Amino acid sequence: MVKKKLSKSEESDQSRINLKDDKDLIEQKIKKAKTDNDSIPSEINGLKNRYEAANLISIYANINEIEVARVLKEFGGKNFSTLKSKLSESLIERICPIGTEIKKLLKDKNYLNKILEQGSKKADIIAKNNLKEIYEIIGLTKFT
């Protein structure tokens, strides 16, 4: 089986973490994320030409709102299973509540229709004002 790095441009759903992914699926995707056999470097220059490693470390840093250097200091010398475990925990903590809310909202068709109607009314007002300004700028009069 060929392992691939997580990527939003890939067609496969297994290549990225989606907002609606549940806990088990997030863990599975992170476990299967491609890495190399070397341990995690403790300095940024140790990530040179280690794209998969850099990708996972970058995701961990971003989801936890910390610098890559801090991640390398924390995980340097350790194997990737340690980072993947912590990354899964962080992603689950951040993403699962969003997915739960999305699923809840998608079930409430009345609420969604109300939001769509409100948005349509706002867009209509903006469009009418823009059209009025355009007519004035180019010197046309609108016949009603």
Kindly label every feature range from the protein language model.
Residues 1-144:
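Conserved nucleotide- and phosphate/pyrophosphate-binding catalytic cores
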